Amino acid sequence: MRDFKTYLSVAPVLSTLSLGFLTGFLIEMNRFFPDALTFPFFSF
């Protein structure tokens, strides 16, 4: 039961950090390439 409580306390922290990183990445990409439907380095 203690391990389950540890899991419940770690999962929100990891999800918050990963979502914070993702939002920061998207904000910076929109700052450097505003209104881009496709990014230049993703084109093949």
UniProtKB/Swiss-Prot annotation:
Keyword Secreted found? no
* Family annotation (InterPro entries): PSI_PsaJ, PSI_PsaJ_sf
Q: What membrane topology does this protein have?
A: Single-pass membrane protein
GO BP field: photosynthesis
Membrane-crossing ranges are: 7-27
**Any single GO CC term annotated in Swiss-Prot or TrEMBL for this entry:** thylakoid membrane
Q: What does this protein do?
A: May help in the organization of the PsaE and PsaF subunits.
UniProt family annotation: Belongs to the PsaJ family.
Q: What is this protein called?
A: Photosystem I reaction center subunit IX
This protein's encoding gene: psaJ
